């Protein structure tokens, strides 16, 4: 039934964010401040390589061009390299990326690249080792920096770095970040702190609009770039004097959802139409046999009829997202 995934608002979906675990070994203040707590799913309960192969095959048939593997921390899965290779079996999928805390990047970047990974996003919320430790609960700053070096050495031409923008934590460190990306092709993406079910107090204390940074970048001569159809939601800025780029992800900005091009599947096989939506559509019963592909594609396409025009974060409605590891942030 191959046809491009399109919703009731004529938005086309080229991008799948696929969570492969909700386990994480970091304790970031904005995500899992008390550390990972199993939610009734054992490691054996997460999608298998065969199930991942089937779900990505179905999405590829429906026009998906990019798959991002998320968590939790994806690299904690021992079969992570096999998962990359399984996704890469689909010729229609042109980009396979991972969002990682960088814990195992120095060790494994070359193997991931060889398996077919084309993009790496690393979470780095501070360039100060002590503050990094305070935010993540792990004294791994130098290890993560070595991982970014290893990614470049492995042949990744660009590395994306995700930084959650927090008032009185890192929002005043723009000059430090800019100096870091000046000589290197790093796309540094500042992500507005988002309210989650478990993070309301933190949100009220530390949220700051990315508009503040955008105004400053424009004042300094940074130029807004056009988005490609399978790009994520970042507004990307470049500057002739910098090898790196700046991205801004501002989910509270008006019309943020108008260009939505991505869907999410959780680590237990639920399709989520929005990071902050309700419920979810189970796909797992249709991931057990190759012969189920038509039914799987139909269920995915039919589910899109229910996708809302916008999220409801402005009303502090975070849907089922209790924390950002739940369905892959």
UniProtKB/Swiss-Prot annotation:
EC top class, as a word: lyase
Domain Radical SAM core, residue spans: 8-234
Pfam families noted in UniProt: Mob_synth_C, Radical_SAM
Keywords: 4Fe-4S, GTP-binding, Iron, Iron-sulfur, Lyase, Metal-binding, Molybdenum cofactor biosynthesis, Nucleotide-binding, S-adenosyl-L-methionine
Residues annotated for [4Fe-4S] cluster 1 binding in this entry: 24, 28, 31
Entry EC number(s): 4.1.99.22
Binding site for S-adenosyl-L-methionine: 30, 72, 123, 194
Binding site for [4Fe-4S] cluster 2: 257, 260, 274
Keyword Cell inner membrane found: no
Subunit structure: Monomer and homodimer.
Family indicated by similarity: Belongs to the radical SAM superfamily. MoaA family.
Protein name stated in the entry: GTP 3',8-cyclase
Source organism of the structure: Salmonella dublin (strain CT_02021853)
Lineage of source species: Bacteria, Pseudomonadati, Pseudomonadota, Gammaproteobacteria, Enterobacterales
